[in-house]
Amino acid sequence: MAKIKIGINGFGRIGRLVARVALQSDDVELVAVNDPFISTDYMTYMFKYDTVHGQWKHHEVKVKDSKTLLFGEKEVAVFGCRNPEEIPWGSVGAEYVVESTGVFTDQEKAAAHLKGGAKKVVISAPSKDAPMFVVGVNEKEYKSDINIVSNASCTTNCLAPLAKVINDKFGIVEGLMTTVHAITATQKTVDGPSSKDWRGGRAASFNIIPSSTGAAKAVGKVLPVLNGKLTGMSFRVPTVDVSVVDLTVRLEKSATYDEIKAAVKAEAEGSLKGILGYVEEDLVSTDFQGDSRSSIFDAKAGIALNGNFVKLVSWYDNEWGYSTRVVDLIRHMNSTK
């Protein structure tokens, strides 16, 4: 069977990790990377050495020339175009483009990739107007005539599978989410200007920083039955990877905490295996580093006030889990052709 050929625009945190996922997949082939700000030798260095996920150990990575990287024997074209419509995706056969710059996140901007020969674009961020899909929740609603999609956010990917299970089994009347979230690249190493978000400009390594997030509201887009029932906020904390969702909900149908645990466990071992996880051990954030699942329910951490009011806790590697889902979404899109 022919491999799915993908290109990556933007070789930042998600771009590089999507590349790692793709290069470890038998059915996906990375054919090109575009980044106007990074030379090929620096790309090689950034790919090989990763503070969080460790050194790349699968095969040698080296520069063939200024426009080609070698991953083992595999050649990957490198482009340096600032304007997406100028990237010659068609010349290397890249059918699917992962848009991971964080810049071209609406349909119109992302559509520029189609002019260069790409067939489909997956935006690795929430989008104001592109249809959003969360694998394990609503990917089956994807139709093959949709050319531009959003993989939502890492937090929505954690929250939505859990919310779906709880709503399907017990019904959610309303809920509030807090994500305790690791540092990301948009934050500051020392206090610096951040005119749109004053608190967000404070030193990331020294502060717990309250922040806004659209992740809970976005669940209403991928699960319309929950539209208007969830909202939430974020605390940015001084860790480099792995985040945790605290979902506090009022249930329609009364349930014991043990019944809730059993429902989540059944789905984690059944239809959502590989997407939703379930743990009863006494784990902490670093134990989930490199976990490819979207959401790992922490059975011991949750609490119930009564049969209708519960707090549920679910972990996620906000980098690796999310990057794995980007590739899974591409696989699903390809299967509908």
Curated annotation (Swiss-Prot):
Principal cellular location given in the protein's record: cytoplasm
CDD domains per UniProt: GAPDH_I_C (cd18126), GAPDH_I_N (cd05214)
One Pfam family in the UniProt entry: Gp_dh_C
Segments of this protein annotated with the region Binding to NAD: 1-151
Pathway assignment: Carbohydrate degradation; glycolysis; pyruvate from D-glyceraldehyde 3-phosphate: step 1/5
Catalyzed reactions per annotation: D-glyceraldehyde 3-phosphate + phosphate + NAD(+) = (2R)-3-phospho-glyceroyl phosphate + NADH + H(+)
Presence of the UniProt keyword Repeat in the record: no
Presence of keyword Transport: no
Broad EC category: oxidoreductase
Gene Ontology BP terms: glucose metabolic process; glycolytic process; response to anoxia; response to heat
E.C. designation(s): 1.2.1.12
List of residues binding NAD(+): 13-14, 35, 82, 318
Active-site residues annotated for this sequence: 154
Function (record text): Key enzyme in glycolysis that catalyzes the first step of the pathway by converting D-glyceraldehyde 3-phosphate (G3P) into 3-phospho-D-glyceroyl phosphate. Essential for the maintenance of cellular ATP levels and carbohydrate metabolism.
Protein's recorded name: Glyceraldehyde-3-phosphate dehydrogenase 3, cytosolic
Name of the coding gene: GAPC3
